């Protein structure tokens, strides 16, 4: 699973990385993003960057997976997070996981997570037993993983984006 910031890293280094990443599928290594991340890309104001990232996704063969979430709804048109119906973008979480996900979604001083989109992207990677490729900035990611690990066992293998330099 690619962190959204990793897509920006690939975009910034596209000349060097796209051809290398394109060969992953030949080695039976697949890259994924969630439907939430695709929605974030589609909301970008910079049309050139949006088209370029979508083209990179297509060239590399990045696959989209449904996001695991406890919420299915139609958001109001004025709400910034989603611009249309998000039914069909999600799979429901396991009932046993609902209490801790609800707790993690509440931002408090003792709960640094707060970002629901990042939380459900991470949860999706854990439940689908994927590696998670992140940028060098782990300040958002580490507290989230630490908190989530208190409630759900995971075998998430985290790779930082400098791993891409060795391809």
Regions found by a protein language model. Give the residues of each.
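Active-site neighborhoods of divalent-metal-dependent phosphate/nucleic-acid chemistry enzymes
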Residues: 69-132, 138-139
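Short, flexible/disordered intra-domain loops and linkers
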Residues: 44-47, 51, 91-93, 108-112, ...
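Short, well-structured N-terminal submotif of metal-dependent ribonuclease cores
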Residues: 1-64
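Extended interaction regions within the primary functional domain
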Residues: 56-60, 64, 72-74, 112-116, ...
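A short acidic, often aromatic-flanked loop/helix-cap motif at beta-alpha or helix-coil junctions
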Residues: 39-41, 68-79, 161-167
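Acidic, PIN/NYN-like endoribonuclease modules and their adjacent C-terminal/linker elements
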Residues: 111, 122-167
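Alpha-helix capping/helix-boundary segments
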Residues: 6, 37, 120-121, 139-141
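Alpha-helix boundary/capping detector
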Residues: 32-33, 67-68, 151-152
């Amino acid at each position: 699973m690619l962190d959204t910031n990793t897509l920006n890293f690939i975009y910034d280094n596209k000349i060097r990385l796209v051809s290398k990443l394109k060969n992953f599928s030949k080695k039976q290594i697949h890259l994924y993003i969630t439907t939430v991340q695709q929605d974030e890309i589609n909301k970008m104001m910079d049309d050139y960057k949006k088209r370029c990232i979508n083209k990179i996704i297509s060239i590399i063969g990045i696959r989209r997976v449904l996001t695991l979430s406890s919420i299915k709804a139609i958001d109001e048109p004025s709400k910034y997070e989603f611009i249309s119906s998000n039914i069909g973008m999600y799979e429901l979480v396991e009932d046993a996981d609902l209490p801790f996900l609800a707790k993690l979604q509440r931002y408090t001083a003792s709960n640094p997570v707060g970002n629901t989109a990042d939380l459900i992207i991470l949860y999706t990677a854990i439940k689908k037993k994927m590696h998670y490729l992140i940028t060098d900035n782990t300040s958002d990611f580490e507290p989230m993983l630490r908190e989530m690990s208190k409630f759900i066992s995971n075998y998430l293998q985290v790779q930082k984006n400098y791993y891409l330099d060795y391809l």
